[in-house]
């Protein structure tokens, strides 16, 4: 069971994790543009 959970976790966590990462990247880019 642990192997199945280990393989399933990344599949479910990636779609949930990447939107937050993209938002952070956009926030950093907008901050960099405003600073420049």
From Swiss-Prot:
Propeptide part(s) removed at maturation, as residue ranges: 1-10, 20-36
Q: Does the keyword Hydrolase apply?
A: no
Q: Does the keyword Ligase belong to this entry?
A: no
Q: How is it modified after translation?
A: Processed by the macrocyclase-peptidase enzyme POPB to yield a toxic cyclic nonapeptide. POPB first removes 10 residues from the N-terminus. Conformational trapping of the remaining peptide forces the enzyme to release this intermediate rather than proceed to macrocyclization. The enzyme rebinds the remaining peptide in a different conformation and catalyzes macrocyclization of the N-terminal 9 residues.
Per UniProt, its applied use is:
Amanexitides have a structure closely related to antamanide, a cyclic decapeptide with antidote activity against amatoxins and phallotoxins, and might therefore exhibit the same activity.
Q: Which InterPro entries match?
A: Amanitin/phalloidin (IPR027582)
Give the matching NCBIfam families. amanitin
Job description of the protein: Cyclic nonapeptide that belongs to the MSDIN-like toxin family responsible for a large number of food poisoning cases and deaths.
Name of the protein in its database record: Amanexitide proprotein 2
